[in-house]
Amino acid sequence: METRKGNRLSKIVTRTGDGGTTGLGDGTRVGKDSLRIDAIGETDELNSTLGVLLAEPLPENVRQVLLGIQHDLFDLGGELCMPGMTFITNEQVERLEVWVEDFNADLPRLKEFILPGGSRPAALAHLARTVCRRTERAVIHLHHSQPLSDALRRYLNRLSDLLFVLGRALNRCAGQEDILWVRGFNTQAPDNTQPEGSQA
């Protein structure tokens, strides 16, 4: 593939990773199954999941928040890719906290756990929340052997909180109430709920 000088990422096929290793930002090569690459990959998946959510019709304030988070996640991925460098700041974490408070302020208080779902944008926000939690687990796993910044770890924890609140807020925008978890739901269902054509 021909490349032009000045185009940072114009060369896509490099073949350097065919042996199962990949390069970090500092030039070192590590296995593609390493803890650091796993954390980077989870961060990439989280960002892509937010991209799917952004493809939905959304309130403009939510859209701008999510777009900002996508940029933050590139900072976070860059920090993971450059051991010893710090890109995620306390200010970015605090901004998430402000957004959580702002979006949560107009929501009714929860008296029970809620099920992920409702409108499609809300369901995608909940999906992004679970991917964020998985990303956080991968980061913590890496942190045990290769310490990471406090701000980076806190960012992912706050982001999952924000995505939970956004899921509720997006349902409210769609006129959809929270779907509350009902303890023992299936044991309370009447006998006539047996699927048609099934046999006891």
Predicted features along the sequence, with ranges:
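Phosphate/pyrophosphate-binding loop motifs in nucleotide- or prenyl diphosphate-using proteins
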Residues: 1-200
